Regions:
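Conserved non-catalytic scaffold segment of RNase H-like nuclease domains
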Residues: 26-136, 151-171
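Phosphodiester-processing cores and adjacent nucleic acid-binding clamps
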Residues: 1-33, 54, 116, 133-139, ...
Length: 177
């Protein structure tokens, strides 16, 4: 303790942008995306939904939303969290097909995701598993950005950010890509 001293600690280890390239998102088309998965470990679980929107000048240009058949029953905790059921996934395309479609749809556009490390880990795992090439898109992580800009907030969950920033929020749909 140093009495009479005010100290600010800044965590310079926060990764906000992965595979950084020069982009100005204000005048560039970019993709906001999210994934839903069978669990929390990219090595043993897989994606069951990829959802995304292409945005330019704050306008949605296009949407991508595909469910994926994991060919195994979902854990109840995932159904409870996402409201995605086995019946909804049965007969949908496989993870390799949907991942390839998504990557083709994105092209070389920069990506934005909340808690991007999670989504990136599943994208990288799918690319490796299905020989789709290296996943090296530029990705901006809004959760890391919020941690850096607002370290005093109680947490940096999407629900907290939307409330603090006065952004409309649908509690029932937040765990759907």
């Amino acid at each position: 303790v140093l009495y009479g001293t005010e100290i600010n600690v800044v965590n310079d280890d926060i990764d906000v942008v992965f595979n950084n390239r020069e982009y100005n998102l204000l005048d560039q088309t970019y993709v906001v995306f999210d994934t839903e998965t069978t669990g929390f470990y990219a090595g043993s679980d897989q994606m069951i939904e990829i959802g995304a929107v292409k945005i330019k000048n704050n306008e949605i240009l296009d949407r991508f939303d595909e469910l994926i058949d994991p060919h195994r029953p979902l854990p109840q905790k995932i159904t409870d969290l996402t409201y995605i059921t086995d019946d909804m996934l049965r007969g949908k395309e496989n993870e390799d097909v949907v991942t390839k479609k998504f990557l083709d749809w994105v092209g070389d556009l920069p990506l934005v995701a909340h808690n991007a490390k999670f989504d990136i880990s599943f994208m990288k795992a799918a690319c490796n598993k299905y020989n789709l090439g290296e996943f090296n898109a530029t990705v901006l992580d809004t959760m890391s950005m919020a941690r850096m800009l607002h370290p005093d907030w109680p947490n940096h969950k999407l629900s907290t950010l939307t409330k603090k920033l006065n952004i409309p929020w649908d509690e029932d749909k937040h765990h759907r890509a």
